[in-house]
Amino acid sequence: MKRLHVILSSMLFTAFMVGPMILPISEAIAAEPLTANYSATPEKGAVEFALLKGYMWKYADGQFHGEKQITQGQFVSSLVTIRGLKDGEPVPQLPQGHWAKATYERAQKAGILTDVEINPDKLLTKEETALLVFNAWKPYRGVKDKGFTNTGALVTWGWMDPAPPGQPKFREDLPVTRSDAAVILRKMWQDKYEIELGEKYALEFHKSLKVVDGYLIGTVPKGDKLINITVQFYTKDNKIVGYGNGESFKSKIESFHSMSFIATNSLDSSIAAVYQYQNLSLLERKKNTQQFSFIE
């Protein structure tokens, strides 16, 4: 499933009615916005971004060597760094003193190593890389679409390039270079950033709400240049009344059957956070942020 984009309010309304998706989100909010002007070449820009953010590293000779096939240990280290993982659990496959042991213990506790044959020196294929991505991102976007291989699902989602022309689109055995990995990891870093920012604004909005004399009163957060925020009220005849960044409202509850909070990336309309309010009097909210698959 490709990432859904906000095109029409009516399309959003349909998506929100699918049902709640509840998942834990880290409370940490990244400090730096995504405003750096990088090279137009995706690989070069992604490498620069990875080095700047500190989730990929150069070799001892001072070179990045983007042409080299990435190892399991390198990719797992990047995932652990992006997730900001601190706690671990035993990984008996690695001996005491092994350079990757502490990192793998953190990855193990977070579920990143589920169904993974532990071998830090292993050169990764697309399928092996995609499995690690989906394991690492389960707290944010749920499980992959069961109708695809890991490779097929990640290509369809838009985080991995398809095979070159003339080959099966979802070919699983192709190698993943360090430059390829940098592109994937930047998308993950950015996705985590926007999800956490969306959660921050969703909570700010929720705390602004109050019910007074049959009216729902609240204020849409001002947001920032990256996140566009919309609050939509749905009337009983399915019309939509909307409010945007920084706007306040006082709406008569009996005129509406539900309300949605929608936070999207203003650059590509990808969905950062969605909450559905079905009972406006009680202010109960259910998370409906887009998942890798709506069917688990």
Show which residues each predicted segment covers.
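Sec-dependent N-terminal signal peptides of Gram-positive bacterial secreted proteins and lipoproteins
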Residues: 2-30
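N-terminal propeptides
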Residues: 19-215
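Aromatic/hydrophobic beta-strand junction motif of beta-rich domains
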Residues: 214-223, 296
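Short proline/glycine-enriched turn/loop motifs at strand-loop junctions of beta-rich domains
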Residues: 222-228, 268
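Beta-strand signatures of extracellular beta-sandwich domains
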Residues: 230-232
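Solvent-exposed strand-loop boundary residues in beta-sheet-rich modules
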Residues: 235-237, 267
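Solvent-exposed serine/threonine-rich low-complexity stretches and specific carbohydrate-binding patches
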Residues: 239-252
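Short, aromatic- and glycine-rich surface loops/edge beta-strands on solvent-exposed regions
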Residues: 257-295
